[in-house]
């Protein structure tokens, strides 16, 4: 028994292990190219069953704690491995040994307390390595990256425990495109630790205090292109002029991101600009100036300019003591060489006139997302301000008058590019004044609803996208590029207004079609973006768009952004794929064919009616319908005649001289209704027939060859037949005056044929001895 229990326990463990591995493997989603996604799946280990077909594996944001030697040994073709944001604390020595094709490795934000160079000894082609956010204090006992000759991006360090950088740490690295070091609590930096890297394109350094900043700059200043300092408090920063005054420098750009300055440390940074002579561009992003701008008591007066800095960018600058700030006049002289200035989202409402006049080399000025208005712009664009300014960006400020804005900028004689988008102009005046060299104007997202002659005739590029325009009828003879997307235009502009237009972007309007003739009228048009409109996929439009093979060279967003809005059965389909039926595309031909068919049908109907007495049947039907509207049976008191006699006029002699004599002069006499004698004059003959039949007890039909040729006899027969069958009585009496061949009776006398087959009829005997019996039977039939 114990042995049986032991066997069952072993099988249960095996089954559970297999199910667990299967569940983890199924948590991955892999596409046919070998890209497998397993991020955020709550995995606690690397899934088993991975094969050589896996080329990219994302296991980030899970609960993996361990990477073993066998976990990835079959992934010999793996190029990308993401293991970031897990709980990995152990990586075995040969975990990545078989990944000889690996180019991207992310081990960031785990719990690695020790790093081993053996992990990377076979990763010769590795280009990207991220080790940020782990728990290690140093980069290992030996050179960690000496086996990575092709490494181009390296990220190391953490915000707490990483405190030391040693000379061996970066040995073996000669060129890096990007190096990011997170060392907020750096305490030890051994000189020349970064000097072994001969060329660094971009260095990002997270440093809380600037104590070791100058030592690091000394090592990298000759091998670095761009230096970015993040999350640093520079309150105590002091720049030593002797440190780099005699060294050649290659740094071209400095970036300060989330850095805090004081008035004193700002002066030290300005000194750095002077002594690192290669710096051409400086950027301050989300920085804080903890000062009041009082530089007069400092040594700033000994600095005449900002070195060789040509581009200055400031974004989201915070000045807590802004309302105590000085006029900055002491720094005005430093700005004379600056050519490009960007100050975004920093609550700037005024550029003092004196500062504008000192910016004598300025060619580009961007004051986007600030508080500039016409009143403050008047002071900023004063006389002699920005004398060489060519581009001015005032996007998303507080400008309201287009006319006044243009007038205030007349002092800028060299201005050719103006961006005043995202201001609330709402309307455009009929006339405006602009600087004489204006070539580019951006009025997008300004809520204007119409365009007028206010726009300068010298424009070459105009952007009026995202407004409320429903037409474009301006003549701009020099315009080369027009951006008018996201408006309410229903058609393309007239090409005669824009003779040299080469680029037009008119997507997201309500245009429903355009033709080959319209496009051909723009003789110099090379680029057209017209997608996202409500296209009516007519036959002409589809024929044009689908038949032009070269259309894709002009329509930059063709074919995906061109969708049908109607007809309904192709709505949502790409114009390129839409198909219409023959009837939709050749409607005139279809209508013509239908009309011809209808004409032939009417002609055929007429011929058939003539051949088969159709008109006769129609007349009879109308009379029959009239009869149907009358009461089915006349009341007894309304019966005026014993019998209505239906006969042909050609048989009148027999009726009037024989039958009338025998019946009306009999005792008691019968009262007969004859059309010659008893029909009411002036009344429609059909009504006379109907009324006479209705007021007669019986209807006598005198049948002969003449009878079947009489149209009125046919009416009388039909109305009598109506009574005979609809009222189920014996109202009809047939007298066969002469033998009639049933086959000779016309087809329209179908009811006569039916009556002769279903009712007994009286034959007029030629033998006079039998005639008395005939009259006797007739009288009996009338009385019945």
UniProtKB/Swiss-Prot annotation:
Coiled coil: none annotated. Keywords: Cytoplasmic vesicle, Disulfide bond, Glycoprotein, Immunity, Inflammatory response, Innate immunity, Isopeptide bond, Leucine-rich repeat, Membrane, NAD, Receptor, Repeat, Signal, Transmembrane, Transmembrane helix, Ubl conjugation. There is a cross-link at residue 754 (Glycyl lysine isopeptide (Lys-Gly) (interchain with G-Cter in ubiquitin)). It is found in: Membrane; Cytoplasmic vesicle, Phagosome membrane; Membrane raft. It comes from the Eukaryota. The record marks 349 as: Interaction with bacterial lipopeptide. Glycans are attached at residues 114, 199, 442. One of its GO terms (cellular component) is phagocytic vesicle membrane. Residues 639-782 form the TIR domain. SUPFAM superfamilies: L domain-like (SSF52058), RNI-like (SSF52047), Toll/Interleukin receptor TIR domain (SSF52200). Residues 21-587 are extracellular. LRR repeats lie at residues 54-77, 78-101, 102-125, 126-150, 151-175, 176-199, 200-223, 224-250, 251-278, 279-308, 309-337, 338-361, 362-388, 389-414, 415-437, 438-457, 458-478, 479-500, 501-524. GO terms for biological process: cellular response to diacyl bacterial lipopeptide; cellular response to triacyl bacterial lipopeptide; inflammatory response; innate immune response; toll-like receptor signaling pathway. It is a single-pass type I membrane protein. The chain crosses the membrane at residues 588-608. The keyword Signal applies. A motif (ATG16L1-binding motif) lies at residues 761-778. Belongs to the Toll-like receptor family. Cooperates with LY96 to mediate the innate immune response to bacterial lipoproteins and other microbial cell wall components. Cooperates with TLR1 or TLR6 to mediate the innate immune response to bacterial lipoproteins or lipopeptides. Acts via MYD88 and TRAF6, leading to NF-kappa-B activation, cytokine secretion and the inflammatory response. May also promote apoptosis in response to lipoproteins. Interacts with LY96, TLR1 and TLR6 (via extracellular domain). TLR2 seems to exist in heterodimers with either TLR1 or TLR6 before stimulation by the ligand. The heterodimers form bigger oligomers in response to their corresponding ligands as well as further heterotypic associations with other receptors such as CD14 and/or CD36. Binds MYD88 (via TIR domain). Interacts with TICAM1. Interacts with CNPY3. Interacts with ATG16L1. Interacts with PPP1R11. Interacts with TICAM2. Interacts with TIRAP. PANTHER family: TOLL-LIKE RECEPTOR (PTHR24365), TOLL-LIKE RECEPTOR 2 (PTHR24365:SF17). This is Toll-like receptor 2. It comes from Bos taurus (Bovine). The gene is TLR2.
């Amino acid at each position: 028994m114990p042995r049986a229990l032991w066997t069952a326990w072993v099988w249960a463990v095996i089954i559970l292990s297999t199910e667990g591995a299967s569940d983890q493997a199924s948590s991955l989603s892999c596409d046919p190219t070998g890209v497998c996604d397993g991020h955020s799946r709550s995995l606690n280990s690397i899934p088993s069953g991975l094969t050589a077909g896996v080329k990219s594996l994302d296991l980030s944001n899970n609960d993996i704690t361990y990477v073993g030697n066998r976990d990835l040994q079959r992934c010999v073709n793996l190029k990308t491995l993401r293991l970031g944001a897990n709980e990995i604390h152990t990586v075995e020595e040969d975990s990545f040994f078989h990944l000889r094709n690996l180019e991207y490795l992310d081990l960031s934000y785990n719990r690695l307390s020790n790093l081993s160079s053996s992990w990377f000894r076979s990763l010769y082609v590795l280009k990207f390595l991220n080790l940020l956010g782990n728990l290690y204090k140093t980069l290992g006992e030996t050179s960690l990256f000496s086996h990575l000759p092709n490494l181009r991006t390296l990220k190391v360090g953490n915000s707490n425990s990483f405190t030391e950088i040693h000379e061996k740490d970066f040995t073996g690295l000669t060129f890096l495109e990007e190096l990011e070091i997170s060392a907020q609590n750096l305490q030890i930096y051994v000189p020349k630790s970064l000097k072994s890297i001969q060329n660094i394109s971009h260095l990002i350094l997270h440093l809380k205090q600037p104590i070791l900043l100058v030592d690091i700059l000394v090592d990298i200043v000759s091998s670095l292109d761009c230096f970015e300092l993040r999350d640093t408090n520079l309150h105590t920063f002091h720049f030593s002029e002797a440190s780099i005054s005699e060294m050649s420098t290659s740094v071209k750009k400095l970036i300060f991101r989330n850095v805090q300055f004081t008035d004193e440390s700002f002066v030290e940074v300005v000194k750095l600009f002077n002594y690192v002579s290669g710096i051409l561009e400086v950027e301050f992003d989300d920085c804080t100036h903890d000062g009041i701008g009082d530089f007069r008591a400092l040594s700033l007066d000994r600095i005449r300019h900002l070195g060789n800095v040509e581009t200055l960018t400031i974004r989201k600058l915070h000045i807590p003591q802004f309302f105590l700030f000085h006029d900055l006049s002491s720094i005005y002289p430093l700005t004379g060489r600056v050519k490009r200035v960007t100050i975004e989202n920093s609550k700037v409402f005024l550029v003092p006139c004196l500062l504008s006049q000192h910016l004598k080399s300025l060619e580009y000025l961007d004051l986007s997302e600030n508080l500039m208005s016409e009143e403050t712009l008047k002071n900023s664009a004063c006389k002699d301000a920005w004398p060489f300014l060519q581009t001015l960006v005032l996007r998303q400020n507080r400008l309201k008058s287009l006319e006044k804005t243009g007038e205030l900028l007349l002092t800028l004689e060299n201005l050719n590019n103006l961006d005043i988008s995202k201001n609330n102009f709402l309307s455009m005046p009929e006339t405006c004044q602009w600087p004489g060299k204006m070539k580019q104007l951006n009025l997008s997202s300004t809520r204007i609803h119409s365009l007028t002659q206010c726009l300068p005739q010298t424009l070459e590029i105009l952007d009026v996208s995202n407004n409320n325009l429903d037409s474009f009828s301006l003549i701009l003879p020099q315009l080369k590029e027009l951006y008018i997307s996201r408006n309410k235009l229903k058609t393309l502009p007239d090409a005669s207004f824009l003779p040299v237009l080469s680029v037009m972007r008119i997507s997201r309007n309500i245009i429903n079609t355009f033709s080959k003739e319209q496009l051909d009228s723009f003789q110099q048009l090379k680029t057209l973006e017209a997608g996202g409109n409500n296209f009516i996929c007519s036959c002409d439009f589809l024929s044009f768009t689908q038949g032009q093979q070269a259309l894709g060279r002009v329509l930059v967003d063709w074919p995906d952004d061109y969708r049908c809005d109607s007809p309904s059965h192709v709505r949502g389909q790409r114009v390129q794929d839409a198909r219409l039926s023959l009837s939709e595309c050749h409607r005139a031909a279809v209508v013509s064919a239908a009309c011809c068919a209808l004409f032939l049908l009417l002609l055929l109907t007429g011929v058939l009616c003539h051949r088969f007495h159709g008109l006769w049947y129609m007349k009879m039907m109308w009379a029959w319908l009239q009869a149907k509207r009358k009461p089915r049976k006349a009341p007894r008191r309304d019966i005026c005649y014993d019998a209505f006699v239906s006969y042909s006029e050609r048989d009148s002699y027999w009726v009037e001289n024989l039958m009338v004599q025998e019946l009306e002069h009999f005792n008691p006499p019968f009262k007969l209704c004859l059309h010659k004698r008893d029909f009411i004059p002036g009344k429609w003959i059909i009504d006379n027939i109907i009324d006479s039949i209705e007021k007669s007890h019986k209807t006598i039909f005198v049948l002969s060859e003449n009878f079947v040729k009489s149209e009125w006899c046919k009416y009388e027969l039909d109305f009598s037949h109506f009574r005979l069958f609809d009222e189920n009585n014996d109202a009809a009496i047939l007298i066969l005056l002469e033998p009639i061949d049933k086959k000779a009776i016309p087809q329209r006398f179908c009811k006569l044929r039916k009556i002769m087959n279903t009712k007994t009829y009286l034959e007029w005997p030629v033998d006079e001895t039998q005639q008395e019996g005939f009259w006797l039977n007739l009288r009996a039939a009338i009385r019945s």
